[in-house]
């Protein structure tokens, strides 16, 4: 009979899933009210015209239109939603 006890399984070998952050709707994409445009930690992107910001810094659309990114003062990136009539 063998006197060596069999080894147990390791307690490791797991990892947490990714956070699924990032840009969900890119420039010139059509959005409707409530569409999530960006999921982020902190304000890497700042809310501009016709968008709102959630408590977890998620930027979402308030109107139907098209996504537009622009640089503001101090090189901040702003996200706007432009109405279809104002897009040229």
UniProtKB/Swiss-Prot annotation:
It holds the Pfam family Ribosomal_L27. It comes from the Bacteria. InterPro entries: Ribosomal_bL27, Ribosomal_bL27_CS. Coiled coil: none annotated. One of its GO terms (biological process) is translation. GO terms for cellular component: ribonucleoprotein complex; ribosome. The keyword Repeat does not apply. One of its GO terms (molecular function) is structural constituent of ribosome. PROSITE patterns: RIBOSOMAL_L27. Residues 1-24 are annotated as: Disordered. Keywords: Ribonucleoprotein, Ribosomal protein. Belongs to the bacterial ribosomal protein bL27 family. NCBIfam families: L27. This is Large ribosomal subunit protein bL27. It comes from Ehrlichia chaffeensis (strain ATCC CRL-10679 / Arkansas). The gene is rpmA.
């Amino acid at each position: 009979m063998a006197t060596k006890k069999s080894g147990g399984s390791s307690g490791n070998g797991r990892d947490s899933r990714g956070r699924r952050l990032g840009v969900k709707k890119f420039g010139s994409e059509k959005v409707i009210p409530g569409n999530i445009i960006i999921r982020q930690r902190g304000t890497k992107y700042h809310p501009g015209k016709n968008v709102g910001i959630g408590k977890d810094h998620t930027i979402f659309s308030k109107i139907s239109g098209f996504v537009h990114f622009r640089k503001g003062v101090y090189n901040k990136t702003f996200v706007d939603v432009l109405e279809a009539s104002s897009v040229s």
